[in-house]
Structures are given as C-alpha cells and as structure tokens.
Design a protein with these regions (language model features):
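P-loop NTP-binding module
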Residues: 1-129
C-alpha cells in the first residue's frame, strides 16, 4: 500500500490510487495508514463530503461500509452520521454495558439503524432441546 485515505484527504492522491482490491470479488478497501489528526474536523470537511459522493457515484450498485470509532468514544460518528444512508451498530461481546448500548442507541435515534452485530462472540454448540 503506497497511498491511503491520509494522502487522499491531504489532496496528495486520487481515489483510484488509494483503493485496494483484495481477492474477494466486488470488494474494495480504502485503507488508512495512521490515525487522522483532528478526525472530527476532517470528517465534517468538504473533502469527506466529496469522498462520500464520489464513492456513491462510483459504487452505486454496492454497499459502502465506513468503519468508525465507537459512538461514545468521540464525536466522529455524530459528525458524519447525516451523510450516511444507514447505520449498522457493532457491539463487542462482553465489552459494552447495557447502559453504553442504550446511550449509543440514543445517539443514533435519528439515524436509519438497520441492525446490530454482536462481534467477538465465541461460537457455542447447543443442542436443539
């Protein structure tokens, strides 16, 4: 990976130069090399709005997923949320309290929440009865 989202947002690369095609068909990744300083400000910038529009136009028949920090850890999610069509809440098994989940849902009250994923759960074999 020579260039990433960092260079794209710094206007040092074009979108097609930072997209990575892993071996999965119809799957593209836009990686980040390092944390973006002042991420809340960056996410509210015209550059990110343009990026989202560009991805919408380029991949109009696909689903675009943005992996963001936890809702309660920063303002990043709240800042960029109005730009998204829908939201999928990811809850880490054993790491989030009921209160934290409820508070996260409160922050997402005006979003088009399409579901919740329980992540980091250990599979358990159970009999039907």
């Amino acid at each position: 990976m020579e260039k990433s989202l960092n260079e794209l947002l710094a206007d040092e690369a074009e979108l097609q130069d930072v997209l990575v095609n892993p071996t999965l068909p119809r799957f593209v990744v836009l990686p980040t090399r390092e944390p973006i300083p002042l991420s809340t400000e960056v996410l509210s910038s015209p550059a990110v709005s343009h990026l989202i529009s560009d991805l919408r136009d380029r991949y109009n028949s696909r689903i675009v997923i943005f992996d963001l920090p936890p809702v309660l850890s920063s303002d990043d999610v709240i800042t960029v949320l109005p730009k998204f069509d829908c939201v999928l809440l990811v809850v880490a098994n054993g790491m989030n309290s009921k209160k934290e989940i409820e508070e996260s849902l409160h922050h997402l009250a005006n979003a088009n929440l399409i579901g919740t994923v329980l992540n980091k759960a250990e599979p358990q074999n159970r009999s039907y009865y």
